[in-house]
Amino acid sequence: MNIDYAKTLGYIHDIGKKFKYNEKGVFPHAMKGYKYIKSLGYDDDYAGICIKHSFLNNDIDCISNDRDETDKSNENYDFVKQYISKEYSIYEKIINLCDLMCTTKVLTVDKRMIDLLYRHGVYAKTHYHIEETIKLKEYFDSLLGYNLYDLFPEIKENL
């Protein structure tokens, strides 16, 4: 495990949010981040996290809200759908999980899902996104051989 690489992906995955844009949905910040990192000379091993962190389970439909319902007409839709179809690396899965557990503090995935429901509402894909979030957490529990939350003592304060 390359810890510096994992940290770097964590630092840059949401870099597209630094740009101003009027479009709604996941695509704007994902694509702006991807293009920005590429413009700096980095390859897809780095830039790809800007896209892949927004979609669980290699599935363009696995999002936490329906703000992207109209994005099938987005110029980037086909590119993103194909791009995320490849198996995610362990690093990309770690960033997905961390993105789901962290806001201003570390949360259980259950509490993070409630946070997303509160802020975005319940949509057609919400149940699917919650199921995949729980599967991702269970994947890491299995990989570790114990409950992932044991790595985060501060989570006990949030239970």
Where are the language model's segments positioned?
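His-Asp-centered metal-binding catalytic motifs of divalent-metal-dependent phosphohydrolases/nucleases
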Residues: 3-40, 47-58, 99
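Divalent metal-dependent phosphate-bond-processing catalytic cores, especially two-metal-ion Mg2+/Mn2+ enzymes
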Residues: 1, 12, 22, 42-44, ...
